[in-house]
Each structure stands twice: as C-alpha cells, then as structure tokens.
Amino acid sequence: MISFGIYLAERGLVPESLLRLFIKQFSLSRLTEAKSEDKKKSVIDGLNRGPIAENTIDANEQHYEVPADYFKAVLGPRLKYSCCLFDEETTTLGEAEIEMMELYLERAQIEDGQTILDLGCGWGSLSLFLAERFPNCNVYSVSNSKDQIEHIENIAKEKNLKNIHPEVQDVNSLSLEKEFDRVVSIEMFEHMRNYKDLLDCLLYTSPSPRD
C-alpha cells in the first residue's frame, strides 16, 4: 500500500494537502516507535550481535579504491575526505581543511610527543597534518584501502616524515599492539555497526581515552 502511494506521489497524482497529512502522520508514528524502550533495546541488541562493520569489501570497491588522482581533482589540497570548517574569514577549501583540523587538535588536546591512532584515516589529511605539526608524535594511520595507504606513504616519503606509520587493516579484525594517548576517528562511525566491540577494542589500547 505504501509503495503504491509513493508511486502515485512521485508522479504528481496525490494532492499536496493529502501528501502533507500522510508525511505528518507517518513521521509521528515513527517518532512514537523510536521512543519505545523495547524498540531501542531491540536495535541495540541487533547492533551488538553483528560485526563491527558490514560490507567493507563493497565499500572499498565503490569509492575507497578510486584512484587518488580523482580526489585530487575534487577535494582540497590535503584531500580531506570529510567536513571542513568555513568561518567568516575562510575563503578557500584549503583554508577550511586547516581550520577543521586545528579544531580537532584543540578538542582532542593533542600535544607533541603523544602516540596517536587515526582510525579510518582516509587519504591521510589529519595524519599527515599531525606528523608535520608535531615531529615528536608517532601517528598510526589505519585504513581499509590499499590506495589510501599507498598515497599516505608516498606523501610521507616526499616530505621526509618518519613519524607516520600507515597500514591497511579491516576494522573487523583490527589488531592494535600499541597503547595510544589519543585515538581519533573522523566521520567513520556512521559506517560502523557494532559500536560496543569497536569501543571495547579502542579503550583497551588507550590508557587515558578522551571522548
């Protein structure tokens, strides 16, 4: 029934007043359902029974293994594969990349000399930024993409950065043998499913974790 209604609406065959009424009622029913404690528990239990992430191979094929040259054409100079920060004085994408990473540093209280894990590092914008800014830090960059890790290795070699350590890992079989002072993960958690197992793994590796 709903699919037939959508079919009619997409073809402009449903009066706007009726469409608005349906959307309002449907939204209210979903909100009521979402507030149910049983529903919340069911969702959490379902997430906790699954893997940390699903379809990681498909995700790679869809966009993570797209050649770096493509992203160089559409992203900023640091290939920041996540949100940037435009304030009133920021006029370019390159500046917005830096502004956002400065905010990460402030909020995570990152300092020189720390050991840092960048989980889901993308094309290495933050990892490389940290390695350049803090020469006494050791930055471990983890991605599921061979192309991304290869790109980071190439940039690190060009800039003679010895304190950055990129490696390919699937988050479902994450192997972390070091302790980290900071674990940063930028816009990766929306791709995760079993948050509990992931956070348990990360808390084990960090002696003083921060939110």
Task: List PLM regions with ranges.
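Conserved SAM-binding strand-loop segment of SAM-dependent methyltransferases
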Residues: 160-171
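Conserved class I S-adenosyl-L-methionine
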Residues: 113-120
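A short, conserved alpha-helix within the catalytic core of class I
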Residues: 192-202
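Conserved SAM-binding loop of SAM-dependent methyltransferases across substrates and taxa
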Residues: 125-134
